[in-house]
């Protein structure tokens, strides 16, 4: 079985998704993992494809001409004050470009809150055929494997991973 690789957007964050796709193809990657969920961080580029139809068209052309596929989108963060429906436009784009998953991480709240919100994200992603892959980040609220597994077991969603 051939190993397949995905170019993560954080590796080339200064490149919009179309350019990133051409780079991935030239470097031999099978997939790209894009960041169409804008977080509003200082200096962060905005690649909200749902709000940028021209960039989305260019991205689709790049995918079609290179054969590179979309592995996942990021980052559906769980944080206090989150309304998970804000991620719906990005999930629609993810499904439109053939992505497999939404990457998520948990950055705030008590356990009951973040389990509920992660579950809601899973529920929103499921009709699009997307899994929601929980990443634990050392500086986040859910910051180790044990905590991530606890969340996955607690939500009991078939598309949680």
Where are the regions that the model predicts?
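Acidic/histidine-rich catalytic cores of soluble enzymes
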Residues: 3-9, 15-21, 32, 94, ...
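Structural motif corresponding to the early beta-alpha repeats
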Residues: 18, 29-120, 126-131
